Amino acid sequence: MIKSSNLRARKRLKKQILDGVAHIHASFNNTIITISDKQGNTLGWATAGGSGFRGSRKSTPFAAQIAAERCAEIVQEYGVKNLEVMVKGPGPGRESAVRALNAAGFHITSITDVTPIPHNGCRPSKKRRV
């Protein structure tokens, strides 16, 4: 017979981390928010698609706002207070995700645009004809 003390799942102790980095990847189709510590270890993440939005509703600012709120809930267990925000991509969820993180109670220390810009690298795709 197994002892009942061994049956209980051990909950991992979460380290208290004060400063974090929020990476917001805003594409035309979806928004991905990842919050990590200063070393780059992921603390939590959320996406607009994973928040219950499908199809064209994934690419709305409201979906990005809900995803940022969900990510903030996950990360607040670690005690994160200050965030550096790194925004990547041209999507519609850029600003609303930053505003949602600010409204969630984080002190935003800096906002940086890290969108990759080619110095005439790859040939762009052909123009859409609708």
Swiss-Prot record:
Alphabetic keyword roster: Ribonucleoprotein, Ribosomal protein, RNA-binding, rRNA-binding
**Is the keyword Magnesium assigned to this protein?**
no
Q: Name one GO cellular component term.
A: ribosome
Quote the InterPro entries the UniProt record gives.
Ribosomal_uS11 (IPR001971), Ribosomal_uS11_bac-type (IPR019981), Ribosomal_uS11_CS (IPR018102), Ribosomal_uS11_sf (IPR036967)
- Explain the purpose of this protein: Located on the platform of the 30S subunit, it bridges several disparate RNA helices of the 16S rRNA. Forms part of the Shine-Dalgarno cleft in the 70S ribosome.
To which protein family does this belong?
A: Belongs to the universal ribosomal protein uS11 family.
UniProt cross-references to HAMAP family, sorted A to Z: Ribosomal_uS11
Name of the molecule in the record: Small ribosomal subunit protein uS11
What broad taxonomic lineage does this protein's source fall under?
Answer: Bacteria, Pseudomonadati, Pseudomonadota, Gammaproteobacteria, Enterobacterales
